[in-house]
Amino acid sequence: MADAAEDSRALFGAAVRAALEAWPALQIAVENGFGGVYSQEKAEWLGGAVEEYFFRNADLELDEVEDFLGELMMNEFDTVVEDGSLPQVSQQLQTMFHHFQKGDRAALKEMASLITQRKCKVRATALPTAGETDEDDDANSVEEMEVAATNDGAATDGVCPQPEPSGPDSQTIKEEDIVEDGWTIVRRKK
C-alpha cells in the first residue's frame, strides 16, 4: 500500500513538472536567463516547490495557487506573468491534485500525457523600440503625420488656420522667412 502511495506521489510530481515545462511564461524566463545563471536549476526546483506546496496545503483555492505561482515567478525569475496563462496553469495543477487526492491515477497520467503532447517550444523576440531604430533610416525617410484641428467644434482637414494679425502693430512676416515646409522663421527684434 505504501508503494502505491509513493507511486501516486511520484506520478503527481511528474505531472506538475510536465505542466510547468509546458508553461510558455516559464520557458521564456528560463530561456532568457531571467533567473540568473541558474535559471534551469530554479525551474527544476520550482516543480518540487509547487508539489510540496500542494501536499502541505490540501484544500487550496484557485487564487491561492495563482498567488503562489505568481510570487515564485516574481521572486525567482523577476517576471510578472501578464499573458493570462497563470490562471490556466493554476487550474491544471489544482485539477491534477484533485485526481491525486481521489487516487485517480489513470486521469492523472492522461492529463500529464496530454500536456506533454501539447507542449510547444516558445521563443521570445524583442521588438525594436523607437530608440533602437537605425539613425540612417531616420535621416532618409520622411514621416508624415495627419492632424485634425478643431475650430469651435468643427474639424478641419489637417490644416490649421493661420493666426490672424492682432492689430495694426502686428509684425509683418517677410516672404523669405517662410520656409518651403510652411514653417515660419521667427527672428528677435534688434
Swiss-Prot record:
Q: Which domain of life is it from?
A: Eukaryota
Question: Has UniProt tagged this entry with the keyword tRNA processing?
Answer: no
One Pfam entry name: WGG
The Gene Ontology biological process terms listed for this entry are: maturation of SSU-rRNA from tricistronic rRNA transcript (SSU-rRNA, 5.8S rRNA, LSU-rRNA)
- Per UniProt, which keywords does this protein have? rRNA processing
The answer to keyword Cytoplasm applying to this record is: no
Q: Name one GO cellular component term.
A: nucleus
InterPro entries named among the record's database cross-references: Pre-rRNA_process_TSR2
Q: Where is this region: Disordered?
A: 152-176
The protein's job, in short, is: May be involved in 20S pre-rRNA processing.
- What PANTHER family is this protein classified in? PRE-RRNA-PROCESSING PROTEIN TSR2 HOMOLOG
Family that this chain belongs to: Belongs to the TSR2 family.
The entry's protein name is: Pre-rRNA-processing protein TSR2 homolog
Taxonomy of origin reads: Eukaryota, Metazoa, Chordata, Craniata, Vertebrata
